[in-house]
A protein has these predicted regions:
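Intrinsic low-complexity, intrinsically disordered segments enriched in polar/basic residues
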Residues: 1, 111, 144-145, 160
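The Walker A/P-loop phosphate-binding site
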Residues: 2-110, 120-136
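Loop/turn-to-beta-strand initiation segments
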Residues: 85, 146-150
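Conserved ATP-binding/catalytic motifs of P-loop helicase motor domains
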Residues: 136-146
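Conserved small/polar residues in nucleotide/adenosyl-binding loops
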Residues: 153-159
């Protein structure tokens, strides 16, 4: 009979080789409200929670459905209320400063970094570079001493097949 796999050595070596890596489950402890109690309840099971920080959340839908209002407006504003720094990556160059300010989003450089990119590859590079820099600065700090940041990416994806 084969011995059961001893994961303890692997866990120890992998967590040492990747700075900031943790193992096991990590339930979210920070939630960002969508500004809509019904949507919060659908996403999180709680009227006051909304989107979990540290998880990937996608809002998709038809043009005019309110994705930009919910995400660019409400989620960014609510994140800023919790002192969460926002990186806004806009591939459409569709989110203008006056519109965001009208939704009570603080567009100052201390609270928001807006980046305009053209290609999906650029989005991946920006997020990857940010994650590497964040890890290099904060991997050795206790979780409560790390600043919180969130990336909101505004992408247009083709909805029809182009031949």
């Amino acid at each position: 009979m084969a011995k059961p796999f001893d994961v303890s050595k692997f866990r120890k070596s992998i967590t040492k080789s990747v700075p900031g890596l943790s193992s096991g489950f990590r339930d979210p402890d920070t939630w960002i409200s969508t500004g809509n109690y019904t949507l919060n309840k659908l996403i999180s099971g709680d009227f006051n929670k909304g989107v979990p920080l540290g998880k990937v959340t996608v809002f998709a839908g038809e043009s005019g459905a309110g994705k930009s209002f919910i995400c660019a407006g409400n989620l960014i504003r609510e994140a800023q209320k919790q002192d969460i720094f926002v990186i806004l990556i806009d591939s459409e160059n569709a989110l203008d400063e006056q519109w965001l300010q009208a939704l009570d989003v603080d567009t100052s450089e201390e609270k928001l970094m807006k980046l305009n990119v053209a290609m999906i590859d650029d989005v991946a590079k920006v997020i990857s570079d940010f994650a590497k820099e964040y890890k290099s600065l904060y991997a050795d700090k206790e979780e409560e001493d790390r600043p919180k940041a969130v990336s909101y990416t505004h992408l247009t994806l083709p909805t029809k097949r182009i031949v």
